[in-house]
């Protein structure tokens, strides 16, 4: 089961109450974790998934924000992705530091090698300080409109 938007985690919980899905697919990145409602909804859905042995697949790990007006859209994504190798590494390491999480790769073949390198060289989870600095430097923003 998949979805997009700030209500997707809450909607997945409602769906899991009615149907026995094998996996859920939800956006998860540093910005999502600190959204006013999404982070808590995501964690509640993850807890239900763990209780019911449902796999958690994450998407949008490399989402930087919406494409700026007039920006050259040089990637095959509907949002502006992270491009800097260090930023990609931080984003991938942060998501994969969660036990049992799957990270579905970004849909752009030019960014995929950096994602694979980051996943191959997995180390400890970046600290909150490192991730806050990363988020500020990268200019992370909502890809789902107003947050």
Spell out what each predicted region is.
Residues 1-147:
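Beta/alpha (TIM)-barrel catalytic core signal, keyed to glycine-rich beta->alpha loops juxtaposed to Asp/Glu
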